């Protein structure tokens, strides 16, 4: 009887762990979607265009010398030190909006998502007593979720900070 109870308790615990891991995985997948779809963007530590900007919710607008990158949608975080530092309220708000519009509602609270991300080992760092890290961004200190960058985007080496425009194939008269 004790062995059966222990097995049931372990099975129930595993269901909880699996559910939290799947919530964390869904959160990451939805985060990738909102960035790729242009519903949100992530800036560098100072609020400007980051490396890997196209994968982080930025797009090129304008042409020629007037071409520039612009963040799309709401700013939900910052990227530096190989981490994405997310504002939990902003990120969950945008992600919830997408998840409910596609019929796959992410109903978890910010706190339960942060806990699920921590338990799934998806947080790069967090304070000992909370699932957030106090971080300085854009001249202010705030508590943010710190995710490993490689969970959200693939990195094949350092990208150029700004786009390289290739005019070699153009017929430019001088």
Q: Which residues does each PLM region occupy?
A:
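Extended alpha-helical interface modules used as scaffolds for assembling large macromolecular complexes
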Residues: 1-174
């Amino acid at each position: 009887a004790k062995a059966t109870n222990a097995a049931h308790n372990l099975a129930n615990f595993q269901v909880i762990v699996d559910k939290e891991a799947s919530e964390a995985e869904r959160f990451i997948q939805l985060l990738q979607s909102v960035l790729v779809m242009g519903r949100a963007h992530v800036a560098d530590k100072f609020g400007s265009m980051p490396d890997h900007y196209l994968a982080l919710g930025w797009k090129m607008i304008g042409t020629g010398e007037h071409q520039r990158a612009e963040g799309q949608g709401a700013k939900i975080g910052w990227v530096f030190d190989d981490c994405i530092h997310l504002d939990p309220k902003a990120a969950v708000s945008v992600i919830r909006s997408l998840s409910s519009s596609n019929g796959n509602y992410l109903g978890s609270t910010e706190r339960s998502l942060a806990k699920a991300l921590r338990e799934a080992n998806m947080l790069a760092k967090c304070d000992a007593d909370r699932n957030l890290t106090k971080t300085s961004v854009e001249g202010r200190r705030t508590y943010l979720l710190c995710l490993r960058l490689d969970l959200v985007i693939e990195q094949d080496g350092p990208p150029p900070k700004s786009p390289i425009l290739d005019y070699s194939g153009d017929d430019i008269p001088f």
